[in-house]
From Swiss-Prot:
Pfam families: NAC. The lineage of its organism: Eukaryota, Fungi, Dikarya, Ascomycota, Saccharomycotina. Residues 37-102 form the NAC-A/B domain. GO terms for molecular function: unfolded protein binding. Residues 14-41, 125-161 are annotated as: Disordered. One of its GO terms (cellular component) is cytosol. The gene is EGD1. Belongs to the NAC-beta family. It is found in: Cytoplasm; Nucleus. This is Nascent polypeptide-associated complex subunit beta. Component of the nascent polypeptide-associated complex (NAC), a dynamic component of the ribosomal exit tunnel, protecting the emerging polypeptides from interaction with other cytoplasmic proteins to ensure appropriate nascent protein targeting. The NAC complex also promotes mitochondrial protein import by enhancing productive ribosome interactions with the outer mitochondrial membrane and blocks the inappropriate interaction of ribosomes translating non-secretory nascent polypeptides with translocation sites in the membrane of the endoplasmic reticulum.
Amino acid sequence: MPIDQEKLAKLQKLSANNKVGGTRRKLAKKSGTASANKDDSKLQAQLAKLKAVTMDQVEEANFFKDDGSVLHFNKVGVQVAPQHNTSVFYGIPQEKSLQDLFPSIIPQLGSESIDALTQLATQLQNAQAAAPATEGHEAGEKKDNDIPELIEGQSFDADVE
């Protein structure tokens, strides 16, 4: 069988570029979930050491922040290790205002909690309403308090020493 030298040269040229095993393909970049899964497995191992128990039938969780906003977990997983005073909440939090959650929270609370919550809400509303009104007035008073009164014949050097 005769071998065509042109075809042979062409094939050799192609094989020089492609090396043995075919064309080289770039690998897809791994996403950040691999490290997140690694962190989760470490966390699960630590919780296993603490003998944490999974709490079932927890539908939602709310964490109240100092600034009046609430971290709301709609679908939440909870693990508790009471002997170590440790609770773990899994889920995606949504930051909401207290007024948004009032209708859904009130049926779940007892009478004492409702009273405390209404007092907290009124305090927050009063603080928010009073803050813009007093900002300008307090700034003016502060400037007046920082400036000492000048009295003829007295110097302030004696007070410093």
